[in-house]
Amino acid sequence: MDNFAPRRPALSTGLKVDIAFYPLWRSATWGFAPVSTVKVDIVIYLWAANLPFMRPDHRRYAAAALLYAAAFAYILLRWDAIPDPVPVHINIAGEADGFKPKTLINATALLVIGVIMTLALPLCVPPRSLARQTVGVPAADALPASGTAARRVEKLCDATATVMSKIVLALAALFAILNISMVVPDVNLPFWLEIVLWGTFLVYVVAVSLRISHSNNGIAPDAEEETRDHQLRYAGGMGTYSAPNDPMVAAVLPSNPGKIAVNTAHAPGKRYLWRVAASIIAIAVTCIVLPFL
C-alpha cells in the first residue's frame, strides 16, 4: 500500500529572485549609479508543487520578499524619472525637505530598512523547540516539568510566528508603497493618504497582536503545572525569568499568561536572548547608519 501513497515532492527553495543589471554599475561617491540605461531582468520561480507544503508564515515571508523585489525593480525601471537630488524626508506639511544625491542606496533607503527588518524580526520569535527542551537540575528542589505547560508554550510560539509574519508582510507593503511614492514624482501619493496608510498599519499590528494573548485558552493545567505556577507566581518580568531549579527552558508564567517567558538561568534561554538582542541591534544600526551613507 505504501507504493500507492501520495508522495510529497522534494522541497527546494520556494522562492528564487534573480536580478541582472545591464550595463554594469559604476561607483558614484557613496552609492552606485547606472552608466546608462538599466535593464532589469527579474525571473521568479514559484514551484506550485511546493507552495501548498510551505507553512503559512513562510508563505507570508515569501510574499514580503516578492513585494520588496517588485519595488526595487520598479524603481530601477523608472530610474530616469527619479529626480536628482532624490527626496529622502517629508515634513509635516507633506513637502520634501530633505534631499540626497541620486544613488541606489538613497533612492531605496526605506526598502533597505524594510529588508533588514524582514530578516531580523523573525529571529525574535521564540523557537518552538524551547517548549519541550529541558536541562538537568539538582533533584532536591527541582520544579516538575509539565506537559500542559509545554503545550501552552508551543501554542504561543505558533501564534507569535503567525503574528510576526503578518506584521512583516504588512510592513513590506507599506514600505514598498511609501518608498516608490517618495522618489517617483508621477506616482506620488497625497500626504493625507500616507498618514492613513501608517494609521491602518498600526491598527492592524495591534489587532493581530491581541490574538496572541488568547491563543493558549482551553488548556487545562495538569498537576505539575499547578505546582509550577504556585512556585513561579512571583517570578518573571519583560519576557524572562531566572529559575535555576526549573528544568524547563521556557514557560508561561501566571503573572503574564499571554506571553512566553524564557528561563535565563539556562544556556538555551541565554542564546535566544542574544539572538533577539542581535536582531534589535541590526535594525537600530541600519536606521542610524543608513542616513549617513
Per-region residue spans from a language model:
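Alpha-helical transmembrane segments and their helix-start/interface "positive-inside/aromatic belt" motifs
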Residues: 51-67
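Select subsegments of transmembrane alpha-helices in polytopic membrane proteins
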Residues: 60-64, 158-172, 269-276
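Active-site and channel-lining beta-strand-loop segments
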Residues: 75-107, 249-253, 259-262
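Alpha-helical transmembrane segments
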Residues: 101-122, 190-204
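Membrane-water interface of transmembrane alpha-helices
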Residues: 119-142, 208-221
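Membrane-proximal soluble regions of multi-pass membrane proteins
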Residues: 216-265
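Juxtamembrane boundary at the C-terminal end of a transmembrane helix
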Residues: 285-293
